Amino acid sequence: MAAAAAAVAGAGRGGGGGGGGGGAADPGQERSRARSWVGAERSEGRRMEPNEELEEEDSPGGREDGFTAEHLAAEAMAADMDPWLVFDARTTPATELDAWLAKYPPSQVTRYGDPGSPNSEPVGWIAAYGQGYTPNSGDVQGLQAAWEALQTSGRPITPGTLRQLAITHHVLSGKWLIHLSPGFKLDHAWAGIARAVVEGRLQVAKVSPRAKEGGRQVICVYTDDFTDRLGVLEADSAIRAAGIKCLLTYKPDVYTYLGIYRANRWHLCPTLYESRFQLGGNTRGSRVLDRANNVELT
């Protein structure tokens, strides 16, 4: 749980430190603070990687070129640096969760604040931390340095290469991604995920606020170790048990930290798995596909 919790706050800003167990990156020396509206207190908050989410969204006009990727990364960096709405189960009674969810539904919390929305100031992300949230970091700086060296070495860049880099530098966390349009379904899905986090069935999660230009919002649900297939599948099952029926995709954080997006020059697929809801015939509630090998896992 520690690694996933750190990833939620994770770095991507070039932060990181020495080895350490688990697979999460450190948030760049805690350069910013996450605002918790629970109890009207500002709490020290760890960040998620700035590139991780917006690059997963459909790009404007269907574009997926370098300019678009850089623009999305910049937008995500800005979101990472702004205050967050955080429900921290380590310091806040679980009995307060329903009121918090009702006060800050993600379809109504706006990215830059609005007099008619629950927030008058900018909000970067909305997050739920489980009781087991324990910051832990991998060596993101070492990972990025090794990546730069690899690119200039002339050696092949393959999924196996990136997997080994992640293992070597203890950057093993990853996340299931859930994309939904603003509205009741999004709010209902986030409420189910947040409850699962607070009750200990999931570890830690975040959701993006509503953008000014509209478009889908995204929920990220973290796991400690993308190489632990059983753990990844267990998280998928918990997400389905929380009532989520839409398509899920799973992305290791190593791709995020190294800035590898869709339509990249190495022709790498940054998402390892996809999960589709299945009604009946499967007690898990979903069918999970290994995208790289085109093999069904469940």
Curated annotation (Swiss-Prot):
Residues 1-66 are annotated as: Disordered. Pfam families: Bles03. It comes from the Eukaryota. InterPro entries: Bles03, TIF_eIF4e-like. Residues 1-10 have a biased composition (Low complexity). Residues 41-50 have a biased composition (Basic and acidic residues). Coiled coil: none annotated. Residues 11-25 have a biased composition (Gly residues). Belongs to the UPF0696 family. This is UPF0696 protein C11orf68 homolog. It comes from Mus musculus. The gene is Bles03.
